[in-house]
Amino acid sequence: LTVAAPLLRKYGLPATVFVATGYIDGGRMWNDWIIGSIKESPLNRLELRDLDLPDLDIGTPDLRRRAVEVLLPKVKYLPFSRRRAVCEEFARRCRVDLRESLMMTREQVKALPAFGVTVGAHTHTHPILATEPVEYCRTDIVQSKNTLEDWLQRPVDTFAYPNGVPGTDYRQEHVELIRSLGFT
């Protein structure tokens, strides 16, 4: 809101922000848990085999970057509940306490339309839809849509698939679900 939004308004440029509502007002997405934990850890090595992840040396900045590159794809496609548990345990093992929120607040989301920014839904918990039962996806998407409509006091009819790779991150049944929920 302090850098891009004023420029978008000044030059009349359209923009859309897709919001995963479960992380507003203090949340942290799974990838931010991994990156932040590795960045802040006082350790030089992580023992992770019992989490079905490789043990990793993280004693230098380069090793930490490589660890992130190794871990993100391994954790990304875990079902949401497993992914969350792995991230929380991972942060504990890294001996970090990640309190700082990286996401917008509800008030910031509500302010976006004043800058000409469209707000779209992006699920509530940002699951990889293809890894979850369709009914879970429906509930998560509806929660996001309803939350945003409540905050903005207007219809939310745009949606972005988490990660967005057809066939890998979502399937045709998810496309049909999105349409049935009134998204364009």
Model regions: which residues?
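Catalytic alpha-helical scaffold of carbohydrate-active enzymes acting on polysaccharides/glycoconjugates
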Residues: 1-158, 165-184
